[in-house]
């Protein structure tokens, strides 16, 4: 299995992420984080919400894979517990997660993904990535019946 987390961000919280990357390898899952922050995104965020959202879509579009499970993290989307999250990931070999910038996703981008919410609360990118990585590991623990999830 391969899980890739794409985010509009300048950097990742490496220490904790590294821990979850190592733990996911136990389940033969490569967990990768890719931070994207093109120059046009920095400029677009200063102009308008619409331009910012468009720049996020342009940054993410090359990574949308019709053969993968594409999941956009969105605060108003479906949410569930860790067991529901594990069911969503089960039986997929390639999973791409997308975390938009401050202005969220364009509606058109969301049509190409399954939207999922980690919480009704807003998180910084760093916290969202850590929570997502932990939940990916927890989901793998559930799928493979490892006691971590209890």
What kind of region is each of these model predictions?
Residues 104-108:
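Short, glycine/polar-rich helix-capping loops at beta-to-alpha or helix-loop-helix junctions
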Residues 17-18, 82-83, 129-130:
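Conserved strand-to-helix beginnings and helix N-cap segments that scaffold or border functional pockets
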Residues 1-27:
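N-terminal beta1-alpha1 ligand-phosphate binding loop
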Residues 109-150:
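Structured adenosyl-cofactor binding patch, chiefly the S-adenosyl-L-methionine
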Residues 32, 37-96:
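S-adenosyl-L-methionine/SAH cofactor-binding core of RNA-modifying enzymes
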Residues 8-10, 36, 75, 100-101:
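Cofactor-binding loop segments of dinucleotide-utilizing enzymes, especially the Rossmann-like FAD-
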Residues 6, 32-34, 116:
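General small-molecule cofactor/ligand-binding pocket signal
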Residues 2, 93-101:
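Loop/turn-to-beta-strand initiation segments
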């Amino acid at each position: 299995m391969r899980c890739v987390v794409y985010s509009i961000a300048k950097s990742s919280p490496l220490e904790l992420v590294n821990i979850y990357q190592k733990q996911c390898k136990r389940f033969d899952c490569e967990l990768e984080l890719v931070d994207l922050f093109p120059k046009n995104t920095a400029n677009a965020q200063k102009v308008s919400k619409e331009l910012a959202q468009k720049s996020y879509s342009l940054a993410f579009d090359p990574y949308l894979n019709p053969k993968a499970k594409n999941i956009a993290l969105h605060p108003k989307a479906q949410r569930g517990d860790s067991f529901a999250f594990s069911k969503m990931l089960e039986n997929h070999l390639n999973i791409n997660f997308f975390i938009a910038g401050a202005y969220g996703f364009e509606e058109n981008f969301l049509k190409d993904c399954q939207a999922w919410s980690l919480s009704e609360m807003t998180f910084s990118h760093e916290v969202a990535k850590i929570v997502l990585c932990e939940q990916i590991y927890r989901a793998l623990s559930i799928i493979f019946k490892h006691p971590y999830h209890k």
